[in-house]
From Swiss-Prot:
A GO biological-process term: cell adhesion involved in single-species biofilm formation
UniProt keyword Transit peptide present: no
Annotated signal sequence range: 1-37
Taxonomic lineage: Bacteria, Pseudomonadati, Pseudomonadota, Betaproteobacteria, Burkholderiales
Name of protein: Protein FhaE
Annotated SUPFAM superfamilies: Bacterial adhesins (SSF49401)
Source organism (scientific name): Bordetella pertussis (strain Tohama I / ATCC BAA-589 / NCTC 13251)
Encoding gene (name): fhaE
Length: 376
C-alpha cells in the first residue's frame, strides 16, 4: 500500500511541471505581438465667437441671487465647419461609415469653475476668471437656448447639433444650434465698480466623438472655443449704511406727564457710503410701533424684568424737523449719493422719548429700527 501511494505522488509533480512549461511558452509567444498604433485626435484649431453686448445694467445689493442681467449673447457657428480625421481611420470611415452621425461634446475649460447651483435655470453657471466673481457677485450663465443641456461626463455636455462623416472628413451642416451667455447675480457685491465682460479664452474644448457610448468610442478631432464678449458693461452700484447705537439721556419718570409727552431729544448722524451715482432712498421700519403716531417704535414684547414701559422712541428727520414716517411710504431721498462716484455723507436725524401710555414704569428702554436702502 505504501509503495503504490509513493508512485502516485511522484507522478503528479511531473505532470504539473510539464503543463506549466507549455503554458509559459504560449504566454511568451503572445507577448511579442506588436500593438496596433492609434493616431491622436486631429487638432481642429480655435473657434472664436465674437459677440457684442451693448446693454448697460444696474446691479445693487438688493438684486436677488439668480437674477439674469442684461440681454443674452447668442453665439452660432462656434465650431469648425469641417475637420480632418486621423490617418489610421480615414479608409475605414470612407468605405464603411460615410454619412454616419458624429456626436459633438463640449467640455468646459479647466480654468473655469462651475457653481454648484444654477438658481432654477436650465443651464450652467460659471465663475468669472481671476476671482472677479468673489469681488462682484457676478458670474456667467450658459445654456443652449431652446435645447436642453445634456450632461454626458464630468464638465461635459452634448452639443445639440450633430456632425457627420463625409467620406474621410467630419462636417457639420447649418447653424441651428446656439450657445447663449448672460451675466447672472450669484453673491454679495464686495467691490462695486464698472464691470466689463470681455475675453474668455479656452472656454470650451469641443470634441468630435465617433460611436459615442459604445466599445468603439473614439475622439477623432477636437478644438477650443474662445468667446469674446465686447462692450458689455455692468454698473455695480451700491450704498452702505453702517449700523449704529444711539444713546438717549436718562430722564426722570416724573417728567412724563401724559400720553404724547416728548423728552430727551438727541441729535445724531446716519452714515452712508454710495458708489456709482445711484438714485437711492432710505426708509426705517420697526417690528412694533405706536398706532397713529409717526416715527414711534416700541420695545419688543416679552422683555426682561426691569425694563421701562409706557414709553417708546420717536425718530425726527433732521432736515425737515418732522417725525419720520415708518415703512416704505416714509422713504427719504439721498441726493448726496449722486454727487460723486464714491460719496460719503450723513443724514441728520434726531431721536426722543415718546410717552405712549398713562401707565409707565421706570427702567431701561431699548428699541430697534431696521434701515432699508431702496434703489429707484
Amino acid at each position: 500500500m505504501s509503495q503504490i501511494f509513493a508512485d502516485r505522488r511522484a507522478a503528479v509533480p511531473a505532470r504539473v511541471i510539464s503543463f506549466c512549461g507549455a503554458a509559459l511558452a504560449v504566454w511568451a509567444g503572445l507577448a511579442v505581438q506588436p500593438a496596433m498604433a492609434v493616431d491622436p485626435p486631429v487638432d481642429c484649431g480655435r473657434a472664436l465667437g465674437l459677440h457684442f453686448w451693448s446693454s448697460a445694467s444696474l446691479i445693487s445689493d438688493q438684486t436677488p441671487d439668480g437674477t439674469l442681467i442684461g440681454k443674452p449673447v447668442v453665439g452660432r457657428s462656434l465650431l469648425s465647419k469641417s475637420c480632418k480625421v486621423p490617418d489610421d481611420i480615414k479608409e475605414d470611415l470612407s468605405d464603411n461609415h460615410d454619412g454616419e452621425p458624429v456626436d459633438i461634446v463640449l467640455e468646459l475649460g479647466s480654468n473655469y469653475k462651475i457653481r454648484p447651483q444654477s438658481y432654477g435655470h436650465p443651464g450652467i453657471v460659471v465663475d468669472l476668471p481671476f476671482g472677479s466673481t468673489e469681488e462682484t457677485g457676478i458670474a456667467i450663465y450658459i445654456d443652449f437656448g431652446s435645447s436642453p443641456m445634456q450632461k454626458v461626463g464630468e464638465r461635459q455636455w452634448l452639443y445639440p447639433q450633430k456632425g457627420e462623416v463625409l467620406f474621410d472628413v467630419l462636417t457639420i451642416n447649418g447653424d441651428n444650434a446656439e450657445v447663449r451667455y448672460q451675466a447672472i447675480k450669484v453673491g454679495p457685491l464686495k467691490r462695486p465698480r464698472k464691470l466689463v465682460l470681455s475675453q474668455f479664452p479656452n472656454l470650451f474644448t469641443y470634441k468630435w466623438v465617433f460611436m459615442r457610448g459604445t466599445s468603439q468610442e473614439r475622439v477623432l478631432a477636437q478644438g477650443t472655443i474662445d468667446t469674446d464678449v465686447a462692450t458689455s458693461t455692468i454698473d455695480l452700484k451700491t450704498c452702505r449704511y453702517t449700523s449704529q447705537t444711539v444713546s438717549l439721556p436718562i430722564i426722570q419718570r416724573s417728567a412724563l406727564t401724559g400720553v404724547g409727552t416728548t423728552l430727551g431729544m438727541t441729535d445724531f448722524q446716519m452714515p452712508f457710503w454710495c458708489y456709482g451715482w445711484p438714485k437711492v432712498s432710505v426708509y426705517m421700519s420697526a417690528t412694533k410701533t405706536q398706532t397713529g403716531v409717526d416715527g414711534v417704535a416700541l420695545p419688543a414684547t416679552g422683555q426682561a424684568a426691569g425694563m421701562a414701559s409706557g414709553v417708546g422712541v420717536q425718530l425726527i428727520n433732521g432736515k425737515t424737523q418732522q417725525p419720520v414716517k415708518l415703512g416704505l411710504q416714509g422713504k427719504i431721498a439721498l441726493p448726496e449719493a449722486q454727487q460723486t462716484e464714491s460719496a460719503t455723507f450723513s443724514l441728520p436725524m434726531k431721536a426722543q422719548y415718546y410717552q405712549t401710555s398713562t401707565s409707565t414704569s421706570a427702567g431701561k428702554l431699548s428699541v430697534t429700527y431696521a434701515v432699508t436702502l431702496n434703489y429707484d
